[in-house]
Amino acid sequence: AFDSSDQDEEVKALIAAIESGVTQVREPVYLYSGYSRGTNDIGSTYVEIDLTNQRLVFYQKGTPIVDTPIVSGNPDIEGCGTPTGCYALDAKESPAVLTGEDYEANVTYWMPFAGNVGIHDASWRSEFGGNLYLWEGSHGCVNVPYDKAAEIYANIEVGMPVVVYE
């Protein structure tokens, strides 16, 4: 969901509606809204991550501009599976140091979309795709080849939709 209601403004609007005594149908007050209110709420520019097929496709105005194999998180290790859902890109950082309980990784391109889970290059990997994630999976992030991470980073903007599914 890319809509987020403005609770303070919504409370004010509801109080005013109740005090007016007039029955009404109204749209909630939003802090921000999705790219459209039609049948396609994400628009035509977004990142699609297919965990089953270990693939990332970045669509720009409906055209795939990046299509790459990935290594996602290992779903068999608690806390390491890549979360599914619809997100908005939180930030872009280059370079970045990613830290966890038992690791520290230097990456050139960091694009988080779900807290500490994001898309990034993985210079320590020479292969991507297939079933690698089942025995060499990440801690939840989406690892992509360096050149593909650079291309995604150059074209993605904070707030763009990221759709992750199995």
Regions found by a protein language model. Name each.
Residues G81-T84, A96-E166:
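Exported/periplasmic cell-wall-interacting domains
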Residues A1-E78, C86-Y87, A91-E104, Y109, ...:
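Surface-exposed, secretory/extracytoplasmic low-complexity segments enriched in Ser/Thr/Asn/Gly/Pro
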